[in-house]
Each structure stands twice: as structure tokens, then as C-alpha cells.
Amino acid sequence: MNLNSIPAFEDNYIWVLNDDEGKCLLVDPGEAEPVFRALEENQWQPVAILLTHHHHDHTGGVKALVARFPDITVYGPEETRSKGAQVVVNDGEKFNILGCEFLAFSTPGHTLGHFSYFSFPYLFCGDTMFSAGCGRLFEGTPAQMYQSFQKINALPEDTLICCAHEYTLSNLKFLVAILPDDPALTQYYREVNELRAKNQKTLPSILKNERQINLYLRLEDDDLIDKINPDLRLSTPEERFAWLRSKKDNF
């Protein structure tokens, strides 16, 4: 399988997995027109859509795509049924698309019904984990998002994090501001700055790298917490997650 991405809106990525025959899977098609163009340019034939959550920038293109390709199958969590999901997935459910086995699992936080999909090495995690960051908590709690991160962190280290937005640089600006002396962070910040200056994408990320630079995955490290905010030393990882996300919201 080959991984590609289609830019949409200001910073969205619509992910595409295609086989050698040109059949493809689309993830979170928030708008249809850029997808139509990419399908024509690459001679792809879509057979399935995966939806991670109900927000319009992830589901807005579904209706038009199904109208043009009526044989397409749309998978998604219960909250996406009204957005066009035909097959509602359950936590821990496995299914096959284009010969690949996918695991659907619940990752609440950004929304209450958010799901992610894993087919090694690809993780399509929508707006749960971003490179060097996490999604805003529009519906869920910090504790829920923390547990979602724990599920993702249990995947193999060479998992490719295919998140839905190009937020890496803004996430790193925040992390470097609160932890300026971390060598892994500062090095990655320089690399990402160079990529974005050339209008190149920073995704997918790799879980092994995220374990080094994504502070939301390092909240059980007491030495790290001492550097960020010693007042959090006796707090739980969930409380630390809430504090860090709140600081980012107001950065």
C-alpha cells in the first residue's frame, strides 16, 4: 500500500492509501473538490472512506463523494452516522479494506465519540494526537484524552502518525517556550522550521520520535515535570495533561 495526502482547507490533510491497481481508501475527506482532482490526476478509484469524528472539516466531502462513487463504503463511529457513515464501527473492531486489516479503537477527547484506525504501520488518528501536540478538548475531558494517548503509545514505535492537521510548527513553538533547554525539542523545531519555510509537510510523524518530543506522552517523567512546573510534582498524569493543554489553549 502507498500513503499519500491531499491538502484541504488551510491546514488539513486528507490521507489516501492506494494499492498498485489504483484502488484507494480515503480518510476524513472534509471537502470533495481537492479529492476529485487528486483521484483524476492519479487515476485512483476510491472504495472506502474512514471517518474519525463528526466535525465538518473531516466529513464535509462525504456526500459528494458517495454521489459520484455510489459503491464506496463509509466507515465511522456512531457520531458520524448523520455525516454519511454507513458502517458504524465499535471499539476494538477489526475489518479489512483492500487486503489490509484495520483496528478501530475509541480515542475520545477532541470529541466524545472520536475513533482512530490502525493498520501497521499507519495510524489515522484524526484530531487526537498531532506531532508535538494534541487536539483541543471540545467535548471530552483531559483524563479521556490522556487515556487515548496511552492507547496510541502502546502501538509499535515505528507506527506512522497520520494526523489530520499541519500543526507541528505551532505545537513546537509552545513546547520550546516552556522547555527551552530540551535538545530533542530544539533540534526538531529547527528541522520543522526548515520544512515549513519550503512549504513542505511534516507528516506523517513516527511514534518513536513523538515519544521524544511530544510532552503529552512524557507526563509520567517527574524530572521533566520539575523543569516545566515543580508545583505539579505530586499531581497525577491526568492533572498534568490538563495543565499542559490549558497552557497551550492560552499560549
Curated annotation (Swiss-Prot):
Needed co-factor(s): Zn(2+)
EC number: 3.1.2.6
Catalytic function, reaction form: an S-(2-hydroxyacyl)glutathione + H2O = a 2-hydroxy carboxylate + glutathione + H(+)
Pfam families the UniProt entry points to: HAGH_C, Lactamase_B
InterPro entries linked to this entry: Clx_II_MBL, Glyoxalase_II_hydrolase, HAGH_C, Hydroxyacylglutathione_Hdrlase, Metallo-B-lactamas, RibonucZ/Hydroxyglut_hydro
Pathway(s): Secondary metabolite metabolism; methylglyoxal degradation; (R)-lactate from methylglyoxal: step 2/2
Any GO molecular function: hydroxyacylglutathione hydrolase activity
Coiled-coil residue spans: none
Record CDD domains: hydroxyacylglutathione_hydrolase_MBL-fold (cd07723)
UniProt record, GO biological process: methylglyoxal catabolic process to D-lactate via S-lactoyl-glutathione
Binding-site list for Zn(2+) 1: 53, 55, 110, 127
Leader sequence segment: none
Cofactor note: Binds 2 Zn(2+) ions per subunit.
Superkingdom of origin organism: Bacteria
Keywords assigned: Hydrolase, Metal-binding, Zinc
Chain residues that bind Zn(2+) 2: 57-58, 127, 165
Quaternary data: Monomer.
Role according to the record: Thiolesterase that catalyzes the hydrolysis of S-D-lactoyl-glutathione to form glutathione and D-lactic acid.
Similarity comment: family membership: Belongs to the metallo-beta-lactamase superfamily. Glyoxalase II family.
Protein name: Hydroxyacylglutathione hydrolase
Organism of derivation: Cronobacter sakazakii (strain ATCC BAA-894) (Enterobacter sakazakii)
Gene label: gloB
